[in-house]
């Protein structure tokens, strides 16, 4: 089968390979995602894979990039209202491994991040996407501060790192200790951390403290 010349067709086929790769990683782990296994999962031949990617490393990196870019896009979309911390809360709560779909995403993410320390390409992709997420969170905190929704005296740069560290930690421990970190606990911990940054609401006369 010849390689399509239409750029959109090429990208569509690469996306199909990427999706098959993610399914393979989910079933067999990243080490089990051989070219043969990926081809079998997607209904391709190994020759077809060679039309669209130079090697297995490029296929795996493409699949990992797809996961991270999708995460960034979803968080950005959820932060359409940049002035409230509740929008940030909702954006991150939706991504915790509290459902079968999000849990699968975290399992794949964990498989890829295991390669970050020893692989420059994976490290570059990871750093770039996390830089984008930090910008989104920082912009939310800055906008909340301008709107008067952020508590006074908050070190925003430090809070960005703290929020994302908690987010990653909850996701990781939810995979490793699912009984100790069930969905309700994941959400409660993250919600508590973000709401602690909110400016206290003025107490109305007659309202209990």
Identify the role of each PLM range.
Residues 62, 76-105, 156-163, 187, ...:
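Hydrophobic alpha-helical connector segments
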Residues 65-71:
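Short, basic, alpha-helical segments at the C-terminal edge of helix-turn-helix-like DNA-binding modules
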Residues 16, 20-27, 74-78, 108, ...:
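Solvent-exposed, amphipathic alpha-helical segments
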């Amino acid at each position: 089968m010849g390689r399509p010349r239409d750029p959109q067709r090429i990208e569509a086929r690469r996306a199909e390979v990427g999706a098959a790769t993610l399914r393979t990683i989910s079933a067999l782990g990243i080490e089990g995602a051989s070219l043969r296994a990926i081809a079998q999962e997607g209904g391709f031949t190994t020759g077809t894979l060679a039309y669209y990617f130079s090697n297995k490393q490029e296929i795996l990196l493409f699949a990992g990039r797809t996961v991270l870019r999708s995460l960034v896009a979803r968080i950005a979309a959820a932060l359409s209202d940049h002035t409230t911390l509740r929008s940030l809360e909702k954006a991150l709560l939706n991504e915790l491994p509290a459902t079968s779909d999000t849990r699968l995403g975290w399992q794949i993410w964990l498989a890829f991040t295991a390669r970050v320390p020893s692989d420059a390409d994976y490290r570059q992709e990871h750093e770039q996407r996390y830089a984008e997420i930090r910008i989104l969170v920082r912009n939310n905190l800055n906008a909340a501060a301008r709107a008067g929704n952020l508590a006074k005296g908050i070190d925003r740069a430090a809070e960005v790192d703290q929020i994302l560290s908690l987010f990653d930690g909850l996701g990781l421990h939810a995979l490793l200790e699912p009984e100790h970190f069930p969905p309700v606990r994941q959400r409660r911990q993250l919600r508590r951390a973000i709401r602690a940054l909110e400016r206290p609401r003025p107490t109305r006369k007659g309202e209990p403290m």
